[in-house]
A protein has these predicted regions:
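Active-site segments of SGNH/GDSL-like serine hydrolases
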Residues: 123-127, 171-206
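Conserved SGNH/GDSL esterase-like catalytic core that processes O-acyl groups on lipids
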Residues: 28-32, 38-149, 155, 159, ...
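Short hydrophobic segments within beta-strands
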Residues: 34-35, 189
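Helix C-cap/helix->beta junction micro-motif
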Residues: 60, 180-181, 216
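Boundary at the C-terminal end of the N-terminal hydrophobic targeting segment
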Residues: 12-16
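Hydrophobic membrane-insertion alpha-helices, especially the h-region
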Residues: 1-7
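Catalytic His-Asp segment of secreted/periplasmic serine-dependent ester chemistry enzymes
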Residues: 83, 191-271
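Aromatic/hydrophobic pocket-lining residues that form the small-molecule binding cavity
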Residues: 98, 163-170, 206, 252
Length: 271
């Protein structure tokens, strides 16, 4: 599997990277992952086998692969969200949001603790769907058309008012990434299927993320459609998860390989 992914990437063209995407890619590509618990499971260094990112890192050519993911994270902000670079509570909270992972990444790069990434992957959305009571305005904007009708959010590093819907939060965070990492390829992963919420709710969440991503010319990977975790199967008996939501080692390995090949094709220029 590694050989096939590497072969695909060797043929890639036009990718935002400090070197041509060739046989030296393994030594030059720095990858950063943002996300929630299914990415957090792999550890910051992407070595724990219950996380998809560990198997992704084993299957995908890179120089470094670092995760800033936190368990319980959402895209969606709240009225009490503030910039916080240290909180790590392992559950949903006002400051456990992708925005703060973006801020941690920016700070790490400024402090020379993190190499400027050539690829950023953001895999989130499960908790936005699961804990809607904690994010009551998450689905107040249903699509990119409604988002365009809303006032544009400016992009200071410390906004006075955070966007409160899922759509606007995705837009804001991605624009912030694009501002600070203009040469970096950004790919969004929608949430996996889960027994915690209906397939329709996960699809709705994925649709919003996908539409916003496409308005920003970002690639979007629909994990709910291509990955191995299927709600119907997990409701019968846990197969690729240990609780219906979080991957076991088998599920993480399957997903990591699927995602490595999918990303490789995207970087090559395929769909």
């Amino acid at each position: 599997m590694l050989v096939s992914v590497f072969a695909i990437l060797n043929k890639a063209h036009g990718m935002a990277t400090s070197k041509t995407c060739n046989e030296n890619l393994r030594d030059s590509m720095h990858i950063v992952l943002l996300g929630d618990s299914n990415t957090w499971l792999g550890g910051d260094d992407c070595t724990s086998k219950r996380g998809w990112n560990t198997w992704f890192a084993q299957s995908f050519p890179h120089a470094t692969c670092v995760s800033y993911a936190r368990s319980g994270a959402t895209w969606t902000n709240t009225r009490r969200t503030t910039r916080n670079l240290t909180e790590n509570v392992g559950r949903i909270s006002d400051n456990n949001v992708i925005y703060n992972q973006v801020c941690r990444l920016i700070a790490a790069c400024r402090n020379k603790q993190q190499a400027i990434p050539q690829l950023i992957i953001v895999a989130a959305g499960t908790n936005d769907a699961w804990f809607e009571n904690k994010r009551p305005q998450a689905f107040s904007i249903q699509n990119a058309t409604q988002l365009k009708a809303m006032p544009n959010h400016s992009l200071p590093d410390l906004p006075h008012t955070f966007p409160l819907s899922l759509a606007a939060s995705v837009q804001y965070d991605c624009l912030l990434l694009k501002k600070h990492f203009p040469q970096t390829r950004i790919i969004l992963f929608t949430p996996l299927q889960t027994t915690a919420v209906s397939e329709n709710k996960i699809a709705q969440t994925g649709n919003i993320i996908e539409q916003v991503g496409h308005t920003l010319n970002l690639d979007v990977v629909r994990q709910d459609k291509i990955c191995c975790v299927k709600r119907a199967e997990e409701l019968k008996h846990f197969t690729n998860t240990y609780d219906g939501t979080h991957t076991n080692e088998q599920g993480a390995q399957k997903n990591g390989i699927i995602l490595a090949n999918t990303v490789a094709k995207l970087l090559k220029g395929g769909s």
